[in-house]
């Protein structure tokens, strides 16, 4: 059974500390280690059976290391990669890096800032790491849909999305990152690259700007605390469609495994790949699971019912969340960190966003996830980390 197949079936190994290794087969640098996929990479890369290993892992993030990330056996580096000076000072000394996993963004659509961040990392690492072999970057399905603003006037591609679809005529920092990656990799002999375009990500990170499971879980927790039903917010003009439409997602661990595959498998070099769990679901199924997990009454889509966005419904709930944190002795967090209402509202307006993943299969990646099980898994992860009760 392959490593990827075993992990898809839940047969992954736990990390066990067996003393410090004196040599490593690979050295990974994760940029954005406290993000939703960076956190998964930090957990999976150091495992004893991870392909390409044993791995030494550096993890880079702008903020101090959070408590929920400290159990990963990595070397944490606090560095603002938007600052050229800070990036050169912190990353240039890392001369043993063999692989870069770039899973960072600014939290805005600003092409220039995101381009600068990526350039800074490459300028610090490539000239100083003679054994650098591969660079992974993560983008996403905005490559096929255009900007997050659903009223932006950009006509998205029809789904299922395939990697050979042309770029849309709209500013998108994904394009900038891809162009920089290909150009810079071509300058160094033997340096390969891969681009990963995941679907909606199911994962865990209180610092992620696009954490759908985090937002929905916090919403359910607040509903339970206030003894109110869990009301599907939907969208004013397409609630029925968003409730019933087929959707897909990509488990954060699966995305990490996908990037590790591309980093070590010759069939994946210098290619672009979509990534998703390999199944589809309807949001009405996920909301039922959400209500069951938090033991709250579900009010789903109903004809004629007035819709209210989560941003509106959760306005002013910061003190309520503070009370919940105190009551259940959770890790101290602010509501705006753990719940991104704007993103949950955008997801509820999304329709027919399905990633085709045949290219990954044809090149040898057979990993998958059951999306319903993945949804529950990440809720349990958040509970175990004391982010939610």
Swiss-Prot record:
<feature type="active site">
    <location>
        <position position="174"/>
    </location>
</feature>
<feature type="binding site">
    <location>
        <position position="201"/>
    </location>
    <ligand>
        <name>NADP(+)</name>
    </ligand>
</feature>
<feature type="binding site">
    <location>
        <position position="138"/>
    </location>
    <ligand>
        <name>NADP(+)</name>
    </ligand>
</feature>
<keyword id="KW-0521">NADP</keyword>
<feature type="binding site">
    <location>
        <begin position="104"/>
        <end position="105"/>
    </location>
    <ligand>
        <name>NADP(+)</name>
    </ligand>
</feature>
<comment type="similarity">
    <text>Belongs to the short-chain dehydrogenases/reductases (SDR) family. Highly divergent.</text>
</comment>
<dbReference type="InterPro" id="IPR055222">
    <property type="entry name" value="PRISE-like_Rossmann-fold"/>
</dbReference>
<dbReference type="GO" id="GO:0043693">
    <property type="term" value="P:monoterpene biosynthetic process"/>
</dbReference>
<feature type="binding site">
    <location>
        <begin position="34"/>
        <end position="36"/>
    </location>
    <ligand>
        <name>NADP(+)</name>
    </ligand>
</feature>
<dbReference type="GO" id="GO:0016627">
    <property type="term" value="F:oxidoreductase activity, acting on the CH-CH group of donors"/>
</dbReference>
<feature type="binding site">
    <location>
        <position position="350"/>
    </location>
    <ligand>
        <name>substrate</name>
    </ligand>
</feature>
<keyword id="KW-0560">Oxidoreductase</keyword>
<protein>
    <recommendedName>
        <fullName>(S)-8-oxocitronellyl enol synthase CYC1</fullName>
        <ecNumber>1.3.1.122</ecNumber>
    </recommendedName>
</protein>
<feature type="binding site">
    <location>
        <begin position="208"/>
        <end position="210"/>
    </location>
    <ligand>
        <name>NADP(+)</name>
    </ligand>
</feature>
<comment type="function">
    <text>Iridoid synthase that catalyzes the first step in generation of the iridoid ring scaffold using the linear monoterpene (6E)-8-oxogeranial as substrate. Iridoids comprise a large family of distinctive bicyclic monoterpenes that possess a wide range of pharmacological activities, including anticancer, anti-inflammatory, antifungal and antibacterial activities.</text>
</comment>
<dbReference type="Pfam" id="PF22917">
    <property type="entry name" value="PRISE"/>
</dbReference>
<feature type="binding site">
    <location>
        <position position="142"/>
    </location>
    <ligand>
        <name>substrate</name>
    </ligand>
</feature>
<feature type="binding site">
    <location>
        <position position="174"/>
    </location>
    <ligand>
        <name>substrate</name>
    </ligand>
</feature>
<feature type="active site">
    <location>
        <position position="142"/>
    </location>
</feature>
<feature type="binding site">
    <location>
        <begin position="80"/>
        <end position="81"/>
    </location>
    <ligand>
        <name>NADP(+)</name>
    </ligand>
</feature>
<feature type="binding site">
    <location>
        <begin position="62"/>
        <end position="63"/>
    </location>
    <ligand>
        <name>NADP(+)</name>
    </ligand>
</feature>
<dbReference type="InterPro" id="IPR036291">
    <property type="entry name" value="NAD(P)-bd_dom_sf"/>
</dbReference>
<feature type="binding site">
    <location>
        <position position="174"/>
    </location>
    <ligand>
        <name>NADP(+)</name>
    </ligand>
</feature>
